Structures are given as C-alpha cells and as structure tokens.
Amino acid sequence: MSKKLKEQAANDASEGDAIKVFVRVRPSESHDADAAFGQCLEVRLPDTIIMHSKPEPKVFTYDHVTAANTTQESVFTAVGKRIIESCVGGFNGTIFAYGQTGSGKTFTMLGPCEDGDNFHHEMRGVIPRSFEYLFSLVNREREKHGDRYEFLCRCSFLEIYNEQIYDLLDPASLGLHLRENMKKGVFVDGLIERAVASASEAYGVLQAGWHNRRVAATSMNRESSRSHAVFTVSIESKEKKAGVSNIRVSQLHLVDLAGSERQKDTKAIGVRLKEAGSINKSLSILGNVIMALVDIAHGKQRHVPYRDSKLSFLLRDSLGGNAKTYIIANVHPDAKCFGETLSTLKFARRAKMIKNRAVVNEDTQGNVMHLQAEIRRLREALCMKGAEGSIPRGPSESGDSQMSNSSTESNGPVSGQQSGSSSSSKWKKYFLEAMSLRDIVEVEKREMREKVSSLEELCSKRDQVISSNKMIIKFRNSTIDMLQKTKNKALLKEDRDLLNENLKKEIEQLQEQLEHNPFVMRYVVENQSLRAQNKKLKMMEAVRSGEAMAATKAEELETLFLELREGLSKNRRYSSTPVDGEKVPTSTLVILKSQIKKLQDELENAKQEHAEQEEMTRTTRLDLESELAAYKKANLDMEKTLQGMKIKNRMDRDAMNDIHMQTIKSITTPKKVTYQLRSRTVLRTAGEETPGGPGFAGLSDNGSPLRSHSTNSLPPSGDILVTNSSPAMSEEGIIDEEMPEHVIEQCNEALTIELQKLQDKNANLQQQLEEHESQKHKMLQNSSKLDHQLQQITELYSTESQAWQEHEKDLTTRLAEATIQISTLQRDYEMTRGEAEDFKVMLQAADKEIGQEKKQKSKVTQDWDRVRAALDAQVVRLENEMCGQSRELENLTEDREQLQDAYNTLQAEHEFQQQREADLENRLKGKKAEITQLQEEIQKHLEKLDSERDKSMRLTAELRQGDNTKKDLLDAQELIDQFREERDDLLHRLDTEALKLSSSKEDLETVNSALTAIKKTDVEQKEALSSLMAALQGQKGMVKDKEEQLASMQMQLEDTRGQVSLLEAALEEGKASGAGLQSQIAALEDRMHAQAGEYQEQIEQMRADAMDANQHQKELLKELEKQSEELTQLHKQMKEKEEEYETKESEHKDTIESLEEQLEEVKTNLSTVVVELDEPESKKRKMADAQAMEIESLRDSEKRFKELSSVYDNMRDQMNEEIRSLKMKADELEDVRISKEILQAQHTALTYEIEQVRNEMAEKESSLKDEVNHLKRDMERQKTVLASMLRDKDEAVEKLYTVQTTLDQVKANEEILQENMDQVMEELDRTSALESTHFKEKEDIKSKLEEEREEKSKLTKDLTRLKEVYEEAEKKITELGGHQNPKQKIHHLQAVKSENYFLKEEVESLEKQLGKAQSDSEQMKRDYEALQKRLTSSSAEPPEEAGATTCIRCLPHSKRIMQTQTA
C-alpha cells in the first residue's frame, strides 16, 4: 500500500469517524409557476446555511455547504475522494443522498437522466466519478508495486421497494432476505456479485441495473425514484512482502434514497400513493435510528431500532458502526418547499452528531517461518528505536573486527628488520582470540553443567517426594483400615497408640518432603534464569519506558481502587440499618459463630505458619552468617598466600637470573670447550623460521656473522637470543675461525631438548601446586564454616537449655497445682454425668415435640408454597403486563416526540406562509397604487390629446377657409409637425403605459392566484394542524388512559407484593421459630456432647497424672454420694409433703363445702342449735391451725431446698472454672513438651549433620588423592594430544588467514553494494515524492478540466437559449413589419435594432469566451498528456534533474490556467 494512502488513512483516523454532512442547494428552475415567491435559503460559504423564518432566522452549520451554481466535480472532490482513498486503505465507506423528492439526489449521485449515456457526460454524478478515481488509485498502486500487489473488485446492485429487496442485476429475482453473520456482518442472501477490472466494466454493471430500477412520474418530478437503490463495491487488495501477505477487505456503499413526498404536492393516487407511504415509513424509521444514536451519544440508554426497516438494518455499520460515512443532503431553495427543507436540515444536523468506529479490515497470511521472521524484524526495529540506533555488537562481530584489524595490520608494509616482531604479534593476536573463544565456551559449559546439576538435584528430590508420598499413602490406608474395623466400637489403647505412631511417621515424611521439595529447586533454577533475562531486558530502554508506564498505570489503578473501596465502605455505612439484638434470628447467629470459628482456625494456622517461617529464616540466617565468616577467613588466607607467592616469585626470578649469568659465564670463559659453547648463540621457539635462513638480518654482505651484545635476562616464552663473543676468544683468535655447521646444529638441538624438559617439568609442578592450593583453600573454607556453625549451635544450645530448665521448673509448679485441682474436677464430673442423663431424657422428649412440629411445619410450608406459587404467577403476569405497558408508553412517547417535531415544522411553515402572505398583500397594495397612478396619467394624456386634436381641427379649418400668407402656412405646418410629434410621443407613452398596465394586471392576477393558493394551503395546513392537534389530544388521552391503567396495575402489583411480603414474613416467622427450636436443640446437643467430650478428655488426661490422689477422690465421691442421697431423700420428702398437702387441701375443700351445706341447712334452725354450733367451729379452728403449721413447715423445707440448689449451682460454676483453668494449663504443658521434643530433634539432627560432614571430609580427602593420581595420568596423555593440537592449530591458522582475506574482500564488496543500495533508496524516495506530487497535480488538473467542461456545457446551453431568444425577436420584427403607423414602426424598428445589436455583442462575447475556454481545455489536455508521459517515463526510469526541471516548468502554466478561470 502506498505511503500516501497510509498517511491519508492515519489523518482520517486522527480526525475522528463522525458522520460528515454535505449540503447541496439545487437551482430554482424558470418554469416553476411559483418562482415569484422567492427563496427561503441563504448560503454562506463554506459551511453555513441560513433559513429565513420568523421571529428569528435559523442558522445551520455543516461540514460543507454549496450554492446552486456548484459543479459536479467540486461535489465529488469534497465528498468522494477521501472516502474512496479510505476504502482502498482498508476502511468501509458509505455515501448516500437524502432529501425530498425533486431535490436533485439522483442527479447528484448519477447525473442527468435525460441523457442515455450519462456515464461519460460532463455532468455525470458521484458514482461514475467514484469508479474512475477508484481504478486510477488501483492502477497507481499496481504501477508502484508491480506483481506484489493484487486487486479484486466485485459489484452488486439492489433496490428496496415496498420493504422488499430485489436484485437489479437479476430481473427475475424475487424478494431476497437479509442475513447476519459474525464474519460478514449484515448481508443479502443470494445477491449476485460481478467481478470488474476497470471503470468501464463497473459502468456496465451500473447501467444494467439502472434500467431495471422502478421510476415513475409525479407532479413534482418527471422521473421520481420509487425505491432505495444501493450499489455496493467490495474491494479486496493483497500485498506480498517477504513471504507475508497483507490482505485488506473493504466495502463501498453508494446509496440513492427515494425522496420524502406529500400527497398534496405530488398528486399521487393508487399505486404511487402506496409507494410514497412505504418510502416515508422507511425514511421515518431511518430518522428514529439517527435520533436513538444521538441519544446514545449524549449518554442515554436507548434501543436502536435497526430491524424495523430493511434499509436501516442494511446500513447498520454505516450508522454508528465500522464505516466512514458521508451524507449529501439535497434541499430545494423555494419557499413552497419550506417544511421539507427544514426537516431535511434537521435530519442532517442530527446525523452529524453520530460517531462511527471505523477500523482497518486487515489480515496477515503467510508461512509460519515468514511470520516468525516478520515478528523478529519488528522486534529488532522496536529495540533499535528504543536504543536510538545504538545496537551493541556481539562477540562474534568483535572477534571479526579484531581479526579484520589484525589482517589489515598484517597486510600493511613492514620493513625487513621488523618482520620477526610482526609475525610474533600476529601469533599473539591469534592466540588471544583463541583463548577468548575458549573462555566463552568454558563459561557456556559451566552454565550448562550447573543447569544439569540443578536438574539432577531436582529429579532426585522429586524421587524422594514420590517415595514419601507412597509412605504417606501407606500410613493413611492403614489408619483407614483400622478405623473401618473399629467403626462401631471404641478404640483400644493399643490401636490408639498405633494410630498416633502412624500419624507421627506421616508428619516426619511430610517434613522430609518439605525439606526436599522439588518445586523449590525448580523455582530456584527458574528464578536464576529469570534474573538473567531480567538483567538483559532492563538494559533495553523500551523495556524501561514500558516499566515506567506500567508503574504509573499501577499507581493510577491503586488510587482508583482506594477511591472505590472508600466509596463502597461509605455506601455500606449509609445503607446499613441498626438491628436490635433481640430481632436477630438464631440462624444468622449460628452462621456468624461458624465464621468466627473458621477465622480463629485460620488465625491459628497463620500463627503456626509464621512460627515455621521464623524458624526457617533463623536457620537460613545462621547458614548465611557461617558462610560469610568462612568467606572472610578464606579471603584473609588468600591474601596471605598471595603475598607469599609474590615473595616466592621474586626469589625465583632472582635465582633464575643468577643461574642465567652463571651459564653465560660458563659458556664464555673456558677455552677447551669453545666449539661446544659457540652453538648457544640462539634458541628459537617451535614453529618459527630459523634465523640462519637466506633472509636473516644478522649476516653482513660478505657472509661473515655479526657480533651482538649479551642479554641480561631470559626473554619470555622461552626465546633466548644470545650472540656473545668474549674478550678471551678475541685474544686467542677464535673469532677469525669459522664454526662447523654440524657442531652448531648439535648444540642447538641439545639445548632445546634440555630446555623443553625443564619447562614441561616446571609446568607440571606448577599445576599440581595450584591444584593442591585450591583443594587446601576449599578444605579450609569448609572447616571454617563448620566451626562457625558449631559455635553458633553450641551457643544456641546453651541458651535453649537454660530456657528449658526455667520452663521445666515452671511446669513442675504448675503440675503440683494441677494435681490439687484434679480432685475437685472429679467431683464435678460425677455431678455433670447425672445432669447429662437428665438432659438425655429431656432431649428425647424434645425430639418427639420437634417431630410433631416438623410435621405441622411441613403442612404449613406446603400450603404457603401453593399460595406463594399462585402469587408468583400473578406477579409474573403483572410484570409482563407492566413491561408491555411500558413499551407502549415508550412508543407513544416516541410518536409524541415525532408529532411534536412535525407540529413544530408545520408551525414554522405556517409562520413562514403568513409572513409571505403579508409581504404579498403589501406588494399587491403597492401594485394597486401604481395602477391607479398610471390610469390617472393615461386619463390626463387622453384629455391633452383631445385638446390637441381640437386645435388641429381648428387649424385645418382655418387653412381651408383661406390662404393668408405663405409664412403663416409654414408656421402652421411646423406647428402641425410639432403637434404630430407630441401626439406620437404621447401615443408611444400611452402604449408603454398600456403595456405596463397589462403587465401589472398580469402580476395582479398572479398575486391573486398566489393568494388564493396560499389561502388554500393555509386552510389545508390549518386542517392538517387541527387533525394533528386532534390526533395529539387523542394520543394524550390514550397516554392518560394508559397511565391510569398502569397506575391501577401498579396498585394491584403493590397489593399483591404486600400480600406476598406478609405471607413471606409469616413463613419466615414460622421458619425462624422452627429454626430457633432446632438451633436450641442442636445447641443443647452440641453443648452436651461438647461437655461430655471435654470431661472425658480431661478425665483421661488427668487419670495418668493423678494416680496418688485416688483415695482422696474416693472419699470425696463417698461424700458426694451421701449428699446426693440426702438430696434424693429431700426430693422424696418434698414430694411426699406436696402429696400430703394436696390431700389435706382437698379434704379441707371438701369439709368447707360440707360446712357450707350445713350452714345453709342450719340457717333456718339457727335459734335452736346455737350451742351445738360452737363445737364444730372450735374443731375447724384446730384443723386450720394444724394445716397452717404444716404449710409453714413445707415452706421452710422448700426454702432449704432452694438454698441447697443455689449452693449446688455455685459449686458447679466453680468446678467449671477450675476445669477450664486446668485445661489451659494442660495445653501449655503440652506446648512445652512439643517444643522440647522439637529442640531435641534439632539437636540430634545437628549432631548427625556434624558427623556426616566429618565423614564427608574424610571421603573427600581420599577422593582428592585419587583425583591427583588420576590427573597425573591425564597430564601424560594430554601431552601427546597437545602436540597434535599444535599441528592442527598451525593448519587452522593458515586456513583462517585465507578466510580472513576472502572476508575482507566480501566486506569491501558489501560496503560498495550498501552504498549503491543507499543511492537507489534515495532515488526511490525522490521518485515516490515526485510521483505523489505528479499524482496530486494530475488530479487537480483533471478536476479543473472537468469543471471547465461543465462550464462549457453551461455556456453552450446559454448560447442556444440566446439564439432561441434572437430567433423569437426576429419573428417579432417580421410580424411588426406591416405596422400601419410609419413613425411608430420606425421607433419600434430602432428599438429592435438596438436590442439586436446588444444581443449580437453578447453572443460575440460568449463565443469569444467559449473559444477561449476551448483553447484552455485543449491546452490542459496537452498538459495532461505530457504529464502522463512524464509519469510513465518516471515510473519506468529513475528521475533525472531535467525531469524535475520540466515538472517545475509545468507549474506556471497551471497557474496561468487558474488565472484565466478566475478572470
């Protein structure tokens, strides 16, 4: 894809994807009968349109507004070019025209309809020009990219007629259906698509479909579109680059909408009226969609009714979706179309507020290797951009550079005396490079070995974990089998001990698993590798910037999280209502208690984990401190050994110097061994040329050896160059004698062999010494580490032992106190056991009651469930009705808004018509006043004419009576002539006034007809307004009825909800009561079980610790039994007393009753039996006194019983408190015991580790000895290998030298190619820039040429019109040729001649302008052809400077053309 299109797409994306609106005002035609009404629009370029209305004019602002005289090319330049460039760049695009019928939509989109071939017409529309521009862009891309750019274009053409979709390319097709897919989106099923490769083929497809479109004539438009036409162009481009294919797919929708119509304007009846209804319905749905999208853009929640119409559903992506959309709003400027124009402008203003989300529809395909290479390339480009072009060189590049530098240095000119030094420097550089490569390989090998060792350790730990898991499974299976055996029985002591042992072993296995966890080792390895990667990544600036951005983003998110949490806490605080403690149900309390218990367990686990973590950190800290101390000690030892080595090296060097001086003296002093010692002049290294060659610089011209001075020390790497002649030799004349060659060779060989042996022996000894030193250093380091650990362990052991002793003392004191309290606990146990039995009986009774209550509750719940189901069904029905009512209410509100909008437009139109009516009435009054004035002037002129006639008649009579004199006749003749001229003038003026009067009468008639039409329209509008008001009132009444129905439904719903809430409350109360009883029973059971379990555990724990207090316990038990027996006796006595009291009370009641009966009987005989009555009253008093005494005694016994029960309760509470305290103490003792066991286990583990370390030290010593012996043997083997390696090294160096020379040549060639490539790229950039400028200039010239053609066609039309006017004028002249009045005829001919002359001048000026325009167009054609030739030549060959100058020379001509156009 070209750079221009990418930049254009980027610019479009940056500007935003809002729907853009272009408003075009059509010209007012002369044949309109109401053209005299004037215009209601005023255009202010470039983006404002003003609509004249009362009380204030309405101002609308859009993206672009054009006047009536605009050209088709300017419309396409503003609308079509950017959309088509975006489509070629991969975006979807849509252009559609909107407006009332007859506003010029089809003309804008297609062109003039009267011409059959309107695709090549000068006035062709947006669609044909879009084809031309699209394929010009495609051809441009093909010329630029060649075969790498593939293009496929498919066209389809459909129409929507009466909400049915028809394929215009298939006339026999029936109604098609819209489908929706995840990949394609919305598409038409079964629609024909034809592939096109040029603009002419696309023209053919459009023309073939256009003939099948439904078009009909109305009173407002000769060829009115009766359907919505959608022409779709699917563009698919494929660009191949480095094996990767970038595929871009886009769609271009070109839509010609049918116009909105009014039946009173179009006079449509029958089928046309039905078509107009469907058109208006689809357009109103489109308006509803745009209103919903505008509401969504303003933040409201709205449903967008895309599916209400086929048109809106098909254009869903174009309206608020993935597309760039341009709307051309066509409006009529005349006053008669005021309402439709206002609604169109409002629609366009609403559409301008919609935002689309356009994205590039691009996909990448290719081979996996190519895609990975592309990803690598992009990452490298990102790294280069982040590092600002500075890429670090790798070791291979540095090595290559060093080798190239060395080669360049070796290739330079060197003198004969420095050949030995250059060869030695070359060998040294090669050696250093080899050593650096060896170091790199060693580092990699070390890393791989560490990785392998870590993986082996990981495998071993994983094996240990597997074995420990197997052991754990085995222990758990055994415990499961044991528990299954003793499922229905109590556990024996042996089984319990076995279970505890298994659990302890399982815990040990788990601890071992924790110590040898493979995941920890794996995480360690991964951590190391990730740290290394992290270091590498942190060096990159892109990663640093990404981290900074991530940190800032994390801070922002954290602040946002804190703000949200504060808001939630505030909401909870505000929303939470205080609830009384009495109203909280028991189920919530149980849930809260369980949550508290869970939280306590989690807290205990966290504390335990915290303690374990502290223990682990303490052990790791001890290990690290010991390692640190060992490293410090090892560093000190190393420094000491280093100082010793330096002193030793200095001494060795002094000794070697002494030996060297002695050897020189021994060589030079004796006289007998002169010949043997002369051979010690030179010792050379292996592999170099001998100095005795033909090129040796130490020989003179005559071949005699030159003398050289003796060296004071041996040169490095075993090279000895000594040329020495002592004074004694010179005295004896040995110098004059020549040395035999075989003697020199034998001496040299003997000395080299001896020196090589000494060097080998020295190297072996040095290596052994270094190995022993390293082993000794490691051993010392380990021993120091172990000593430090041992010291730390002993210190820790001493502190722990002291703490343990203190703790043991505390435990003994606590144990003594616990034994004292056990006796009291035993007593409490017996008491609670009795209470437990009582509770069991109570629980059984409570279970029976609960069962009965459960039955009752199940019946009640079933009844409530039935009632609740019925109420739920009623609620659902009411909610459905409410949803339907709310939907109807929304629809009614939408209809109300639409009616209100229509009412507003009608109101504005009515006000505009009233204003126009007032203007016309004023104009009519003015015309009437003018007519009256003209009539008065005519009357005056007629009267004057009559007086003049009378005068002429009198003069003629006087002339007939007598000829007085010739002079009087002449005067009279002159007067007659003057009168005649005045009469002609008056007649001429009368004719003109008559013409004016006729014209004013015609104007008056037109005004009257306009007034009548306005009155009719006013009446019709008033009727429509009244009907609308009636409909609005009806709608309001319906809305009120619906609201009342909704209110009643809501009341019913509230009542049913209240009933449901009451029923639910009653149900909840029943559930709560049942749950309360169940919770009470469960609490009692839990408390009983818990107390029984606690007491059982306490007794089992304290039996073992309190065996010596059994006797005391037995005594207490006896006393307790006695007290219980006394209590039972007291209970029995109480029961007996109560029974006696009840019997006596009954007897007393019987006696009272009998006495009352006797009293009734005795009342009659009262006077007679007074003496007999005293005896029973005394008996009764005695009996009452006795009963009172018994009652008082019973009350005293009851009081004593209550006191005893209170004492019993107090004792029981004290015993419970003592049991709790003893339990806490026992727990503390258990914790102390566990900590003691842990310390003992740690102590044993540390002693075991120390023994293991000692054993390992001994094993390592023995293994080190074996390794030393093995290394000695290896050294002997490696000596032989070294010799072969040296030979291989020489061969490799020679090969390396040859490769280096070839590499230098390749690098030089590469630099030349890179320079050529840079030049080619610069030329390519220049050509692309020139091509883009040429393309812009070509398109500008093309658009200007099209505008000139359009102006030319307009001028030809004006010329033909003027010719027609001229011909009509000639006809009128010929008609006036037979005029009777000669003077009037002469005046008329003179006026016609002047008019003819004026028209001829105008025609000549127009012909001149036409010729000039033709010459300019021909010149522009020539320039255009020249530009095309230059473009083809520039695309075929790289541009030269001459081409650039010619292109620059073309610019003044285009400026000249522009100047002529402006002129």
Curated annotation (Swiss-Prot):
Subcellular location: Cytoplasm; Cytoplasm, Cytoskeleton, Spindle
Short name of any one Pfam family annotated for the protein: Kinesin
GO biological process, one term: microtubule-based movement
Location of the region described as Disordered in the Swiss-Prot/TrEMBL record: 387-424, 686-720, 1335-1356, 1409-1444
Low complexity bias spans: 415-424
Main location: cytoplasm
Highest taxon in the source lineage: Eukaryota
Subunit and interaction comment: Homodimer.
Protein name: Kinesin-like protein KIF15
Species annotation: Strongylocentrotus purpuratus (Purple sea urchin)
Native organism taxonomy: Eukaryota, Metazoa, Echinodermata, Eleutherozoa, Echinozoa
